[in-house]
A protein has these predicted regions:
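Non-catalytic terminal accessory segments
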Residues: 1-127
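Soluble catalytic domains of enzymes that build or remodel membrane lipids, polysaccharides, and related
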Residues: 140-368
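N-terminal signal-anchor transmembrane helix
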Residues: 66-70, 92-110, 120-154, 159-177
Length: 368
């Protein structure tokens, strides 16, 4: 089994290297044609270094800039593998009507222009959040309360690229909503809380206010950082309660259920968590990954809030997430059960969003 795993890793590295060679070769053909470069050694070193930056940072942890370089390179890879084959085909046909060098120069220039547009538009979408509003009616009676306004933000991935300025946008938009309660269904930080602490983001995040409090759950990236205790400690300092397979009542008006992430195999099921719940009261649940909508509905959850999918983050990845999840983004109602999946406030990897948008969700819940 161990040898099979090594074989898989080796195969992936070989395929990845071939793809990086293809991207690098296209870049060299254009640059050498435009500028007349003949020596490719330095160019090959730079492309190779950038291509493996995300792997190198796992070894050279004292060079955190490599993670940023590697993150941005992921976007370059995706769109290069979409655009460069088209550019190569264009050059092949154009060379029959104009000089090949001219075809290379102009096709490369157009490709770079498309790249610039993709990155400019993607960065704008990533750093310019919108507020999505949903109306949900739960036909249960709550003494002294007819409605509940929820501010929900998932997948902030606070760290290097989703930093202080983006956090301030979150605080501004959330407080502007004047919510009754703030819910954060996972991936609050980007893996390890070190950057969050280093940038002193906690006091800024603490400025988010709601009468009923701020609650969250763990996402897969909190586990990836292997520093869950440190993360929980930071959240506790800023009065954000992280629910770990817990069910609590909010002012005896409704239940709030918070699940551990699917990453933790021993987490409790919805059925177990709901076993002691008085289902005459509304039940709102947070589960980072939206894999178990049916289980939540069968257990008696009224409203499930999730994130994780990013709606693919960079088109056409949304085609994949649409097939992976029953609901990869938006709202669905099935009988008395409601589910909302957010595309997230932040981003993983490159600070780009195409086919999705950085968002905060405002849920207006009404009761009988």
């Amino acid at each position: 089994m161990k040898n099979f795993r090594y074989l898989n890793i080796f195969t992936i590295l070989i395929v990845y290297t071939i793809l990086m060679f293809y991207i690098g070769w296209n870049g060299w053909v254009w640059l050498s044609t435009v500028f007349g470069w003949e020596s490719w050694g330095y160019y090959a070193f730079i492309v190779g270094f950038i291509s493996y930056a995300y792997i190198l940072v796992q070894v050279f942890k004292f060079l955190p800039f490599l993670r940023t370089v590697g993150s941005i390179w992921f976007a370059v890879i995706q769109y290069a593998l979409m655009l460069l084959p088209l550019a190569d085909i264009a050059v092949f046909f154009l060379q029959f009507s104009i000089e090949k060098d001219t075809a290379i120069i102009w096709t490369g220039a157009v490709t770079l222009l498309v790249f610039f547009f993709i990155f400019a538009y993607g960065v704008f979408n990533a750093y310019s959040p919108v507020v999505r509003k949903y109306d949900v009616h739960i036909p249960k009676k709550v003494e002294g309360r007819k409605s509940l306004r929820i501010a929900m933000a998932s997948d902030m991935h606070f760290g290097k690229l989703s930093g202080v300025a983006h956090l301030k946008r979150l605080v501004h938009h959330v407080n502007e909503m004047e919510p009754d309660i703030i819910l954060l269904p996972g991936d609050i930080i980007d893996d390890h809380p070190g950057v969050f602490i280093q940038k002193n983001m906690g006091p800024i995040m603490k400025q988010m206010k709601a009468p009923l409090g701020v609650y969250g759950v763990l996402g897969n990236h909190e586990y990836y950082g292997r520093a869950v205790p440190e993360f929980l400690q930071e959240m506790d300092k800023i009065d954000i309660r992280i629910l770990l397979d817990e069910v609590i009542t909010i002012e005896d008006d409704f239940y709030l259920v918070g699940r551990r992430d699917k990453t933790e195999r021993d987490r409790q099921s919805f059925e177990n968590l709901m076993s002691t719940v008085d289902k005459s009261l509304p039940v709102i649940a947070m589960d980072h990954q939206p894999f178990e909508l049916k289980q939540a509905a069968d257990a008696g959850v009224d409203l499930l809030l999730s994130g994780h999918t990013h709606r693919g983050q960079m088109a056409p990845n949304h085609i994949v997430t649409r097939r992976m999840y029953e609901l990869d983004w938006g709202y669905v109602q099935k009988g008395a059960f409601h589910a909302i999946v957010s595309s997230g406030f932040g981003f993983w990897g490159p600070p780009l969003r195409l086919g999705s948008r950085s968002e905060i969700v405002q849920v207006e819940v009404t009761f009988e």
